[in-house]
Amino acid sequence: MREKIFNIFKSFGENLFQFMKHQPFVIGAIILCFFLFSFFGEVVDDVLEGDSHVLDEKILLMLRDPDNIQSPLGPGWLEEMMRDFTALGGIGLLTLVTAASAIYLLTVKRTRHAFYLLSVVATGTILSNLMKIGFDRPRPDLVPHDSITYMSGFPSGHSFMATVVYLTLGTILAEAAPRKSLKIYLISIAIFIALTVGVSRVYLGVHWPSDVLAGWLIGAGWALAFWILTKYLELRHILRKDQAKTVS
């Protein structure tokens, strides 16, 4: 029995070594993924213990007009722009973007990428809903909500799913990009959109800042964990790489 257990761990260690040998940059991804999930755990502890509440209130009120707490800080066009930004993380648009992207990937014979995208988004959606039900944290009541809400606040579903969807699409596009600068640009755009969605949720008063921070962390960690898993399965020849032309 001991020998069997030893062989299992030995085989896993050898596979992990080969994985890191062929994909050295994945080591950094694993470390980053561990950091993201650990930081998320710290945020959860702070929220459950109430340690984040004072800072949450302070940041939320900083974004409101001091003379009229009913209105967000800044001109009317900024509020309208924030509503547009928050829509980028809405379930309707994300579903449309995911479906359209998956159909395109299937059309150009990038089947593995299509199912990779659908798997990350589907499991992310389930996880987001389960966490909202489990934590059941009330949304801010200090200011009026400038956007319609349906579920509890923690973590921010818009921030979580925007990070998952756009970061996953960014990595798929980056894989086909011929230049490193273009890869960095695509990933940067994905991160920028996710950050913008999260900021808009706090600005509109529908989430505490800690809700949004948690959404970013778990969303990035979830997308990154799936990417690492995919690379590992490719190395083990469990998944076959798509033969796709690079994007020029």
For every predicted segment, state its role.
Residues 14-22, 76-83, 105, 109, ...:
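Membrane-helix interfacial "entry" motifs
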Residues 53-67, 96-180, 184-188:
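Membrane-interface loops
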Residues 3-4, 140-248:
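Membrane-embedded catalytic cores of phosphoryl/pyrophosphoryl-handling enzymes
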Residues 1-92, 139-145:
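N-terminal transmembrane-helix/juxtamembrane module of multi-pass inner/ER membrane proteins
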Residues 37-46, 127-136, 200:
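C-terminal TM-helix exit segments that contain a strictly Trp-centered aromatic cap at the helix terminus
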